[in-house]
Amino acid sequence: MDHIKQQMEILEVGYRCPSNIALVKYWGKKSTGVQLPANPSISLSLGDLYASTTVKASPRTDVAFVFTLAGASKPSFEPKIEAFLNKIAVDCAWLSDYTLYIDSVNNFPHGTGIASSAAGFGALSLCMAHIEQLLMGYAALDGRVNGMDFWQRSSYLSRIGSGSACRSMYSQPAVWGESDAVAGSSDLYAVEMGVAVHADLSGWKDVVLIVDDGEKSVSSTAGHALLENHPYALARFGKAQENLASIVGAMRDGNVKSFIEIVESEALQLHAMMMTSLPYYVLMRPNTLAIIEKIWQFREETGLPMCFTLDAGANVHLLYDGKKDETVMNFVHNELLSYCKNRQYLCSETGKRPVLI
């Protein structure tokens, strides 16, 4: 720390971090530790839907941080950032010497079924980990902190801000949570799946069909808490372990049928857990179900490789083989957009990692 305190220059860094969509869902936290998952999850990065964040670390003033959203003050975001910085302060002692000037912007609107907190905390944590490396004298980002490399450290920090954020660090499918199916997997940070994705399941794309662009009726934090006394929680956690092992095998072997079954089943299990908790919630809307039925019908008629997944809300993610882009997008425009609010949708490729900006 003496080395760090001697270096009181202004440091500035920026990252663009993608959001991600979980295939096997993270839903429920362990009762011990900070933001540790009750089951492992796996996700694909959404490289075209991202947060861009810059952090300038200046010698400490009377405030710990100043936050702006696209250059404008956003007081409603400050409590989450303050809580995050307070939680990591013990692990990042250098923070006490600096004031952070944070500016962030998403290239997608809030309330669209995209994990904005994943992209936002992912980008912020990358900036923090980068500054940490510079303060330690590792300009090439090749230092290790508590045994973690730069990407693991970024994932570790982002997990404390938003659990799903820790899966936004990799171009490969990212696994968060201990699993016998993935070497090196951890509850503390995400790792790459570790095996090559078969050609039949690589290069897939995601169309986010926006059924409802309002605020979610239940926050992620409250939703996770519902699992604490849920009658089906243990069965769900066990099934997630099983599904993670199965989907890793499916992606490795190119078993598209198995991949589709697991992804869609996981989406429905997530909503089933919400509908059978106390209090209970129905987060799907009639148009959510209409879109799902249209996807099933089109897949049955054409045999095209595609499936849906859901977050904890009404919007639908349509995952499909990017090689079938024209056919699928014609289907989206002709059959699905009429079910979307103001015909809104977003598109992204999968499989891109964060970049320095």
Where do the PLM segments sit?
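ATP-binding N-lobe of GHMP and related small-molecule kinases
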Residues: M1-T112, L126-W151, V328-F331, K341-I357
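Short alpha-helix boundary/capping segments
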Residues: A72-S76, S116-A119, Y232-A235
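Short beta-strand scaffold segments in enzyme catalytic cores
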Residues: A22-K25, L44, A51-V55, A165-S168, ...
